[in-house]
Amino acid sequence: MWTLRTMQGREPVLTFRLLPGTIKTLGRAVRADFIVDAAMVSRLHCRLTTQSTGQLDVEDLQSTNGTYVNGKRVQKATLLPGDTLRVGRVDLVLAHAPFNQSATTLEGGT
């Protein structure tokens, strides 16, 4: 399972969880799976795809301000644990943990 967190100081502000084999959109629109209501974030900014193998890919959805991985603008990229995904002025830090199907998990923002 992948976790994306925005941080304010040392405290997480938003946390998103992605289970294996899912596709989620991130943006400021209500129809986005993960809503980030911040300046410079497009309505549908990027798509996150978790493969059944555990790999996480990001694809920019023609956002106005671009999608960045570790400071580099990307159209598509494979993400790794510890990477920073930037949408608008929001940085999301990525973490990966093995998925335990017996554990209760939440998808979406908290």
Task: Identify the meaning behind each predicted range.
Residues 1-4, 89-110:
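Regulatory inter-domain linker segments that are low-complexity and enriched
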Residues 8-10, 64, 98:
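Solvent-exposed strand-loop boundary residues in beta-sheet-rich modules
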Residues 5-11, 43-44:
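Phosphate-binding glycine-rich loops and adjacent basic patches that engage nucleotide phosphates
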Residues 6-8, 50, 96:
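Residue-level signal for short segments within beta-strands and strand-turn junctions
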